[in-house]
């Protein structure tokens, strides 16, 4: 199931034949793949810049870029740890330390992804990279089919599992990404054991699945996540992306083949960083106020409302006898819980709110008590926004309420109807209200 998203604007996209090839030439020699040349964003702050422009430059340079770079770097580590784990299992030398290393790498990668969810607009949404690596709840039936298909298992164990996943994922699309990997690595809030992964799975309905095949799936999906997170970094940063990310994509040209405009913004003419910094009728951001509104509503409130209403709200409503109906006309489900196997739901949701804090404070320091000079919060203060304290208090309260739930000793999946869950819903909903108030106010101000 793809997560429900709302966006302030629709980017201008259309069908286009990609202007590069990684196919062999007439002599059977593979051509060198060249990444699209689209330059990089101009993020240097000048004294002549409008204040809203300074805020956006700081946001792009010091929040969005380093988050995607950390995500891509951690995904490379996750792939390496997953590959090492699979090869050790295949050789009969797997130890618990191999599993623990992969679990730790997973958690580090997951953290950066969750802390990017306040800016899912842009490449993650336009290129459908968000649902590609983060759809939930996990479809256990589809996962079982994938893990018992000899054809798919052979592909996961093949010479290029990342390419195999990229070209064949329609057969197991709903179990790609973080939640398929989570199922392999964690159960009941704990790392899987070496003994468990040396045998068949014991989960209900999965007893025909071999541990070695789960690990083959893990390293194949981790390879795909490595590519997708590199794509996120590159499409936002352009030529400013790290050499490691450029290397990953240069060796995986196939990830571009299903993307319109090479996955880039403004009909393939610029990276998403520059796109956000170019308010005009052409890019779709008609003014700096519109850019501010996109960050507040299309970014921060989009994830804030989802945490309250869906990530926390759906299972809570079912658990307390108030189940509703989804937009698809289906009954809400008690299983609509993110990260149930690792018991890290509250951690995920707090990281989502940290993503909002980082966006507003203009820094990736989640413990920051003072916003950066050119930040949303500093701009609101400079412009004498009367609701600034209410917004700040709502943000801090949402973080603290989730911290209390996280440290309660009970995970969300264990007690989805607990009062602590309602407390979190109320706190995050209040933050959503304050974000909307601030966005409405700033949209009416002059772009000083």
State where each predicted segment sits:
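Bacterial N-terminal signal peptides that target proteins for export
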Residues: 1-9
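Hydrophobic alpha-helical targeting segments used for export or membrane insertion
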Residues: 9-17
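Bacterial signal peptide processing site
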Residues: 24-27
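A eukaryotic "domain-start" boundary segment
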Residues: 29-31
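Mature extracytoplasmic or organellar-lumen-exposed domains after removal of signal/transit peptides
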Residues: 33-448
